[in-house]
C-alpha cells in the first residue's frame, strides 16, 4: 500500500503522463506536428490550416480516447472490486455485446450513422438489464453476474451474426468502422454529452470508494459493519454500467482497457478504491490516446483500429504477469 507522499507523487506522475499522451496523440497523423505547434493551435496562435487539422479532426479524436479510456478503466476497476473477480470488465459483463447488438440493429433499420451510438447505448443497457435480471435470483452473487454476462454476450454475438448474414455489404460497411473501435468517427455533439456523463459517473463511483472497499471484503463482512451490501451493489453496478455503456456507445467496442489498467494501478497503489478508481480513470486516459498514436504510426499510412493495439498490449501484459508468477 502506497503512503500519502507516494500517492501524491504517483498522481503527479500520472498527470504528467496524461499531458504527454495528449500532445503525442494530438501531434500524430498524416501531417506530423510538434508539441509546440499543437500548443500554438490550442492557444490560437497558429495558421488556419493547422487549426483546421487539430481542432476539427484530431482534437475530437484524442478527447474521445481520453474519456473512453477513463470510463472503461474506472468501470472495470469497480466491477472487479464489487464482484471480487479479476476478470470482470465491460466486455465480460455483456455491456460490449449489447452495444454491438444495438449497432447491428441500427444498420438493419438503415438509420443515419449519427444514431448508431444511440442504438448502441440502448443495446448496452438492454444487456445490463438482462444480466441484472438473471443474477437477481442469486442475490447478485459475483459468479452469477459474471456467468450471466458471458451468457448474454454469447446470445447477442450470435444474434449479431444472424443480422449480418441477412444484411447487404453496404449495410455492414455502414457500421464496420464503429464496430472496429475507430476513434475518428466520433460526433462532437455526442462527445460532449458522453464526456459529461462519464466524468459525473466516475465522480460518483469515487465517492462510493469507501463502501466499495467494504463490499469487496464480502457481503457478510459488509453486513457486520452495518452496510446493506445488496442495496449498494445494485446502485454501484448500475452507475458503473452507465459509464461503460456510454464509453462503448461513443466509438465502438475497445476491449481489455477496463481489464488491464485497473490491474496495473492496483499493483502500484494497492486496493483502496478511494484512490484506485480515479487512478484507473487517469491510467485509461493515458493508455488509450497512446494506443491511438501507435495505431496511426505503426503501419502508416495504413491506420489500424485502436482495439487491435489495446488487445495486443493487454495480451503481452498478462503473459508477462503469468511468466513472473511464482
Explain the meaning of each model-derived region.
Residues 1-326:
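Alpha-helical transmembrane segments in inner-membrane proteins
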